[in-house]
Amino acid sequence: MVHELAAYERSAELCRLTDEQLRAALFPAEATSRRERASGADATGPGPALFGHVAESPEGEVFGFALWFLNFSTWEGVHGIYLEDLYVRPTARGRGAGRALLAALAGICQERGYRRLEWWVLDWNPAREFYDALGARAMDEWVPYRVEGDALRALALHPRLAGKP
C-alpha cells in the first residue's frame, strides 16, 4: 500500500521501498538476512525505529495503515510522534479508518506523555480539510529541508565530530 500512497501523491516513480525493507524496519529482530540488516534494520539497536498500525476488515483485509516514529522536542523536553505515512484505500475512505488510525497515535501520545503528533501533507492534498476538522493546524512558519543524493554524499565527506552519537 505504500506504493499506492506514492501513486496517489503523484510520485510513484520515486518509491523504491520493498516488502523486505519494510519488514526489516518494522521487525528488526526478525531481520535475518544480510540484505535486511544492511537496509538499516539494526542501525538503532534491537528495537524498531519504525512503528505501524493497520486498519483491517473483520475478515483481515488491510485497507489502511499509519507508519510512524518517535521524534523529540528539545524545547519541551519530551518525545512526540512523527507520522511518516497515513493511507486509506479509496474504497474505504469516509468510514472512519483514518480517524481511528490517528486516534490510536493520539492515544499513544496521551498514555506516554508525548506532547505532539505531527506530519507533513502535500499542499494540494484534499485530506487537509479532514486534518483541519480534527483540530490539526498547518505549521506555515516552518520550512522543511532535506539533504539527499549527491549532496548527502558530499556532506558526509566533511570532517565529523569525534565520539559516538
Language-model region placement:
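Glycine-rich phosphate-binding loop
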Residues: A92
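Conserved hydrophobic beta-strand within the GNAT/NAT acetyltransferase core sheet
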Residues: L83, L117-V121
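Conserved beta-strand in the GNAT
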Residues: G52-V54, E61-L70, Y82, Y87
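Conserved active-site alpha-helix within GNAT-family acetyltransferase domains
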Residues: R95, R99-A103, Q110-R112, D123-E141, ...
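Conserved N-terminal entry element of GNAT/NAT acetyltransferase domains
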Residues: A7, L152-P165
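Conserved acyl-donor/pantetheine-binding loop and adjacent beta-alpha core of acyl/acetyltransferases
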Residues: S33, T74-I81
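Conserved GNAT-fold acetyl-CoA-binding loop/helix
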Residues: V2-G40
